[in-house]
Amino acid sequence: MSFESTFEGLCEKFRILKQQLSAPETLGTQAFVVASREYSDLLPIMSLIEKYKSTQKEIAELEELVNSASTDPELRSLAKDESHIKQKLLPKLRHELQLSLLPKDRDDSRNAILEIRAGTGGEEAALFVGNLYRMYLKYAERKNWKVETINISTTGIGGYKEASFSIGGKDVFARLKFESGVHRVQRVPETESSGRLHTSAATVAVLPEVEEVDLKIDEKDLRIDVYRSSGPGGQSVNTTDSAVRITHIPTGIVVIQQDEKSQHKNKSKALKVLRARLYNLEKQKREEEISKMRKSQIGSGDRSERIRTYNFLQSRITDHRINLTSYRLDYVMKEGDLDEFIDALVADDQANKLKQITH
């Protein structure tokens, strides 16, 4: 389908929706609600189409003036200049229109749950989890996003076996979803006397946060165990059975929550994580059925499956998916200045989607 015919089809759809919304018999019905939502979604696209078409019309009228033998020389010169300006604007408008037609990820407006886990590399990998955790906290702070800790599992000497937390705010999942995958670190550990460079890894999973109304979980599918929470080394933290382990029997997914002193709060947080994981599982199945272009697996934590490498010796960060390298590692890690990478990943994703709809 050509570029122009796509827009003609959208204009026709917009006209039909307008008719449906003005029909008295649809008022107050579910059909009215659906049509109203579709109409609102199309409004900004229709505005761009109108601008694109009017620019095309203006160019045609200006070219007619330029090519007319009766046009005054001074007016012809002005018309030629104006036509040149409008022709330069047209590709930009066309690109904006193409972007507006890209398939939307319905989860982009959701909040996110991040789960960072140590991969290969022992204690050094656990320390790197802490680096990534603090980096994302700083990034959230820069964006004025709200962070809530879900589960922190430390190693006792400054490292983290796991750090999971939710982030809420504008465009959270839309921007952070590209962080899913294996992050590799190359540096000399403080305990390394020979100064030898070590390579370790951590996995990052970014899940869309799901409300209870979006995903119902049957109580019959859950096994809920309660026990006393424990800290590093296994010592008891609470004298009451406040820790909660929820097993989703059909999938085998297990969520453990013990950060809160209240059993009720731990259960609530565990269910939030379980909903996100189940939703993500269903989403992955849908994506695999529709297209093999993108998969959301984060890998096993093996160093070879990396999406990004952090080389502390060279102060270098390289994102291997888009071949982008920055030598501002210290600032990125300590200040959470991730926009250079995330903006580039968003642009790359848009470019790939454009190829899909234009070929």
Curated annotation (Swiss-Prot):
GO MF annotations in UniProt: translation release factor activity, codon specific
GO cellular component, one term: cytoplasm
Subcellular location, principal: cytoplasm
Subcellular location: Cytoplasm
Stretches that traverse the bilayer: none
PTM sites of type N5-methylglutamine: Q235
PROSITE patterns: RF_PROK_I
Protein family (similarity comment): Belongs to the prokaryotic/mitochondrial release factor family.
Protein name: Peptide chain release factor 1
Record lineage: Bacteria, Pseudomonadati, Pseudomonadota, Alphaproteobacteria, Rickettsiales
